[in-house]
């Protein structure tokens, strides 16, 4: 069975850190319908690290969680430079409080660090910032993270859940 699902604007390529109003409206409409007909937790992810839209949609639609790509890291990729949003998102969450979990990527796929920072520092920053879970991904969609990367993240997470964000399929799930 499935424990939870995430709804993304996966087809809105090329991704940007902001989207057109019509995309937000359509996303909200679709998410609302899915939430009304779902018995599992549902989350919101608006590509790419569009955290203000994610929080607004999650808040309005009673989502269970949001995925935050760059909570405590500054990264670069095809979407340009993406700046850490943790402090601003936490202020937004404080202004519009709701019990919505923050599931945050560590070294999010399709990007690389602008300035190198140790993994333990990144994870500690995400935890201290208020994340409810961490996401471990491979280098791109469909690519699994290494077992060593997952084990290291689990070790450093200090009990915070670690979720695999890419590459899980019938061939890799046993690992």
What are these regions (language model features)?
Residues 46:
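Short, conserved loop-to-beta-strand elements that form functional interface hotspots
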């Amino acid at each position: 069975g499935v424990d939870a699902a995430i709804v993304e604007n996966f087809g809105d390529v090329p991704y940007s850190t902001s989207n057109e109003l019509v995309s937000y409206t359509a996303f909200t409409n679709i998410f609302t319908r899915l939430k009304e007909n779902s018995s599992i937790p549902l989350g919101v992810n608006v590509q790419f690290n569009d955290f203000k839209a994610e929080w607004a949609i999650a808040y309005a639609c009673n989502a269970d969680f949001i995925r935050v790509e760059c909570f405590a890291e500054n990264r670069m990729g095809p979407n340009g430079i993406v700046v850490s949003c943790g402090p601003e998102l936490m202020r937004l969450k404080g202004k519009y409080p709701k019990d919505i979990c923050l599931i945050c990527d560590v070294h999010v796929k399709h990007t690389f660090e602008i300035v190198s920072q140790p993994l333990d520092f990144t994870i500690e920053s995400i935890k201290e910032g208020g994340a409810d879970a961490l996401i471990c991904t491979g280098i791109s969609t469909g690519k699994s993270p290494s077992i060593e990367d997952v084990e290291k993240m689990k070790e450093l997470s200090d009990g915070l859940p670690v979720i695999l964000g890419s590459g899980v399929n019938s061939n890799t799930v046993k690992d």
